[in-house]
UniProtKB/Swiss-Prot annotation:
It is found in: Cytoplasm. Keywords: Cytoplasm, Elongation factor, Protein biosynthesis. Belongs to the EF-Ts family. This is Elongation factor Ts. Associates with the EF-Tu.GDP complex and induces the exchange of GDP to GTP. It remains bound to the aminoacyl-tRNA.EF-Tu.GTP complex up to the GTP hydrolysis stage on the ribosome. GO terms for cellular component: cytoplasm. It holds the Pfam family EF_TS. The gene is tsf. Signal peptide: none annotated.
Length: 282
């Protein structure tokens, strides 16, 4: 039976910001004495990390990875760009990708509780506290996403600005089109589309744009309004929809045409299934 109450355990967590497992270990070692447990955690280099958790985190890195079963992307924030480029911090982020892939997780809270692939004696939350102690700044795992990948898909990853913006592209019809998928991912980072296709634009967005166009054309004949509105929607789709955009490396070709050409050349039914685009803080 434990020599401490749940209230003591809660107090230790609130005071130090250290994970549940290590707090239990500390209280067991200290036979339920709160102050001794704090000292125990300080000796492990964990306790002082909790003091940093209120600090604002505006910098950071986005990282992505893929294995044979899925793709992972994670955003981790810190206080300064200096630490965002620190090798210890970067190693922690790389480990998170393995944890996401191994556990197939998109929930940050659930991710915090799994055993770290980098340090099996610690949870992800506890390793985060150790890393905070090492780099001297608050660290926040802001978001994570796991996407399953099948044997007939190619995944492209492109990172810009040392992890300030990252795109993932999922291309179906072949597992040998990583170069094409990466080219499209690079295009996404540069052009920042909001939607995959015209068909994927939400109805409320279309209605909003139509209202804007109508207001701009107030007083004109209906047939003129309809003609101009059609042109404005074409421009809107070319600006916001990935498949309608001009390819950044060859503006005479849209992304859809780029994929169609590759499909014809390879004899494979290629299709952009979806994409993910993240920017730091966005």
């Amino acid at each position: 039976m434990s020599d401490f109450s749940m209230e003591t355990l809660k107090s230790l967590r609130q005071r130090t910001g250290v994970g549940l497992t290590k707090c239990k270990e500390a209280l067991e070692h200290a036979k339920g004495n709160l102050e001794d447990a704090v000292v125990y955690l300080r000796k492990l280099g964990l306790a002082s990390a909790g003091k940093k958790e209120h600090r604002e985190t505006k910098e950071g890195v986005i990282a992505a990875s893929v294995d044979e079963h899925g793709a992972a992307i994670v955003e981790v924030n810190v206080e300064t760009d200096f630490v965002a480029n620190n090798s210890v911090f970067r190693t922690f982020v790389t480990g998170l990708l393995s944890d996401i892939l191994n556990n197939k997780l998109s929930d940050v809270d659930a991710l915090a509780q799994v055993t770290s692939s980098q340090e099996p004696s610690l949870s992800v939350e506890e390793l985060k506290a150790v890393t905070m102690q090492t780099v001297g700044e608050n660290i926040r795992i802001s978001r994570a996403l796991y996407t399953p990948v099948n044997s007939n898909q190619s995944v492209g990853i492109y990172s810009h600005g040392n992890g300030k913006a990252v795109a993932l592209v999922f291309l179906s019809g072949s597992d040998k089109q990583e170069a094409l998928a990466k080219d499209i991912a690079m295009h996404i980072v540069a052009s920042q589309p909001q939607f995959l296709s015209k068909e994927s634009v939400p109805q409320e967005v279309l209605e909003r744009e139509r209202e804007v166009f109508s207001s701009q054309l107030s007083g004109k004949p209906q047939e003129v309004i309809e003609k101009i509105t059609t042109g404005k929607f074409k421009a809107f789709f070319q600006e916001t929809c990935l498949l309608e955009q001009a390819f950044i490396k060859d503006p005479d070709v849209t992304i859809q045409e780029l994929v169609d050409r590759a499909a014809k050349a390879s004899g494979e039914p290629l299709k952009v299934e979806h994409f993910v685009f993240w920017k730091i803080g966005a």
